[in-house]
Swiss-Prot record:
It comes from Escherichia coli (strain K12). Residues 39-42, 90-102, 152-169, 218-230, 310-319, 367-379, 429-433 are cytoplasmic. This is Putative purine permease YbbY. GO terms for molecular function: xanthine transmembrane transporter activity. It comes from the Bacteria. It is found in: Cell inner membrane. Belongs to the nucleobase:cation symporter-2 (NCS2) (TC 2.A.40) family. The chain crosses the membrane at residues 18-38, 43-63, 69-89, 103-123, 131-151, 170-190, 197-217, 231-251, 289-309, 320-340, 346-366, 380-400, 408-428. One of its GO terms (biological process) is xanthine transport. It holds the Pfam family Xan_ur_permease. The gene is ybbY.
Length: 433
């Protein structure tokens, strides 16, 4: 039975949860706006869709899924993959409507597949493929891809096709770097009781400083126009994009295991049964499926929630649900959406960059479960460097590849993970000294 008793501490923790959910969500719509070449007036609709879907997904997990204080939001793997596919295919002349339609079909299929994994209990077997070595690579490459996105946001770089006339504005970038340093300083140097509010303080301070330094900056414009498939629809289907989306959905299950396993220490009385994973998969798949018409980034439990739980020391669902309720209110009231979305992208990107730097620590924790030698290091080195190479490869050089393979091979993160899964599970590394 859920306890709805309200206290000052739970409300404060709930507000902290809201800003955590908010900052992880608000950075996404502007990148989609840029990547899919939409007018600025569409940003309010995309942002409200994102807040609404994220709040409902958090409720679904809190009451019907894993039932823990773990944020369910736009998955970083999905986000990076969608931006990579869109940029790569658009640069080759593929119509935006074709990209959006194919992604919608692939995301819907992955949602159904995730639900089937939950209903059937196959997730436990698939989890065995994600060995510690694979998770080291996953954390390193996901961190590299996401921090690239956040640095782009800090610099104000476009997320779509490169604009030759674009120039970096140094004063806004300098302010975003100052916000990043403020959050880092709070986390590193202040006592734990103050450091846990670094994200909150950094966001509000950066917000105020931005409008003090750049008072002419425009606010969120446009009216709310509810519509299905705002990124585009009715285009031709691309088997390669659909296949890449389905594979992304399969790889995305690693986030569920990482988040639930990582929070076991906070909920020792709940045990480690398979039922919790099955419910979480069903909730993730269901929310991914029903929100396809809203064109939001598909969901996954956030492993970074572990850091927030550690910082605040509050593991209760109550505070998490309070934060989700505030997020829902922001989604339903356009005036609140406009207010909170006036937080500039460089500021929110700087705060989120700091929150994702600990992915390196997660990678190092997984690496401690492996004994690397001069002979078995190739299980990590080859997938890692192949993935990094493909991440840096300009999309134009893949122009002549078959349409079925092109979206997958242009995604260094996915290729690196798949190569690591194959090498780690097909080669008997335990026999190699």
């Amino acid at each position: 039975m859920f306890n709805f008793a309200v206290s000052r501490e739970s409300l404060l923790s709930g507000f902290q949860w809201f800003f955590f959910i908010f900052c992880n969500t608000v950075v996404v719509p502007p990148t989609l706006l840029s990547a899919f070449q939409l007018p600025q007036s569409s940003l309010l609709t995309l942002t409200q869709y994102a807040f609404l879907a994220t709040a409902l997904a958090c409720f679904a997990q809190a009451f019907c899924g894993h039932r823990r204080a773990i944020m369910e939001g736009p998955g970083g793997l999905w986000w990076g993959t969608i931006l990579t596919i869109t940029l790569g295919e658009a640069s080759r002349g593929t119509p935006i409507n074709d990209i959006a339609t194919s992604l919608a079909v692939g995301i819907a299929l992955s949602g159904v597949l995730t639900m089937l994994i939950g209903f059937s209990g196959l997730g436990h077997r698939l989890a065995r493929l994600f060995t510690p070595s694979v998770m080291v690579l996953f954390m390193l490459m996901l961190g590299a891809q996401l921090t690239t996105i956040f640095f782009k946001g800090m610099l104000g770089l476009p997320f779509g096709i490169a604009d030759p006339n674009f120039k970096i504005q140094l004063p806004p970038f300098a302010l975003s770097v100052a916000v990043m340093c403020l959050v880092l300083a709070m986390i590193i140097f202040l006592p734990q009781r103050f450091a846990r509010y670094g994200l909150l303080v950094g966001t509000i301070t950066g917000w105020l400083l931005w409008y003090f330094c750049f008072p002419s900056s425009h606010s969120l414009s446009g009216e709310l126009h509810w519509q299905w498939f705002p990124l585009g629809s009715g285009g031709a289907l691309s088997p390669g994009i659909i296949l890449t989306a389905v594979i992304t959905g399969l790889v995305n299950i690693s986030n569920t295991y990482g988040a639930i396993r990582g929070t076991d220490v906070f909920y020792p009385q709940q045990g480690a049964g398979n039922t919790r994973y099955r419910r979480s998969f069903v909730a993730t798949g269901f929310m991914t499926l029903i929100t396809v018409p809203l064109a939001v980034i598909p969901f996954s439990p956030f492993v970074s929630s572990i850091g927030l739980l550690t910082q605040t020391g509050d593991y209760t669902r109550r505070s998490f649900i309070y934060g989700s309720v505030i997020c829902l209110l922001v989604a339903l009231v356009p005036a609140l959406t406009r207010l909170f979305c006036s937080i500039p992208l460089p500021v929110s990107s700087a705060v989120m960059l700091v929150s994702y730097l600990p992915l390196l620590f997660s990678a190092l924790v997984f690496s401690q479960q492996i004994t690397f030698t001069a002979r078995n290091i190739y299980r990590l080195a080859l997938p890692l460097f192949v993935g990094i190479f493909l991440m840096a490869l300009p999309p134009v050089y893949l122009q002549d590849l078959p349409l079925t393979l092109r979206p997958l091979l242009s995604n260094g993160l996915l290729v690196g993970i798949l190569l690591a899964v194959l090498m780690d599970n097909l080669i008997p590394w335990e026999r190699i000294e």
